[in-house]
Amino acid sequence: MKLENLNIIIADDHPLFRNALRQALSLSFANTTWFEADSGDALQQVLDKPTVGFDLVLLDLQMPGSHGYSTLIHLRTHYPELPVVVISAHEDINTISRAIHYGGSGFIPKSASMDTLKDALTAVLFGDIWLPNGTEIIPIEDDATDQMASKLSDLTPQQYKVLQMFAEGLLNKQIAYDLGVSEATIKAHATAIFRKLGVRNRTQAVIALQQLEMDKLDLT
């Protein structure tokens, strides 16, 4: 595999960071096309491009709409061949271990040098798992969170998008307008979401989603 002519997504809500990352990596990965997303919803819109085959996602766990590890879980379920590298300002062993536990192909601290970043992405693009030097992954034993992660993975991309919009506090009518579908369609999605998550209403569904957020896992 030649590391050129790649399609790489940078999903982070800080435009200065995205720009710096893109400029630095462009020197190492020739003729790469860079796609950017500043939220979980924007990331899904990029992934929905039917004519683009993506090679890598660089994912910030805390951008708006990401809900911690839930977007990572969603990506691993619906895009299993697409490597996802987590880039985070949180560098503690619990954060790193959960990122790998939920399917990340690597973890890069935002404090890493550009040389380290280049080496990490090269390793992942060649099929390896990359971790900071000296990192020893700890086992994650959290049955309740793992069960919710499994339930979230059952949601279709559209259902996951609707659940994210529930978390933003949008009404069914607003969601229907934004997605260009009928309100009845949103109600049908809601019913399916509640069933798959084992909850009874929107509030419980949002609480379920929040179980995968970093601060709910005492990782801040």
Protein language model annotation of sequence segments:
Residues 60-61, 88:
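Active-site residues of response regulator receiver
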Residues 97-100, 109-152, 161, 214:
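Short, flexible helix-to-coil linker/hinge segments that flank and couple to helix-turn-helix
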Residues 39, 67-70:
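Acidic catalytic/metal-coordinating carboxylates
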Residues 52-58:
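Active-site beta3 strand of CheY-like receiver
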Residues 69-81:
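Short amphipathic alpha-helix used as the core "switch/output" element in two-component signaling
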Residues 169-204:
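Recognition helix of helix-turn-helix DNA-binding domains
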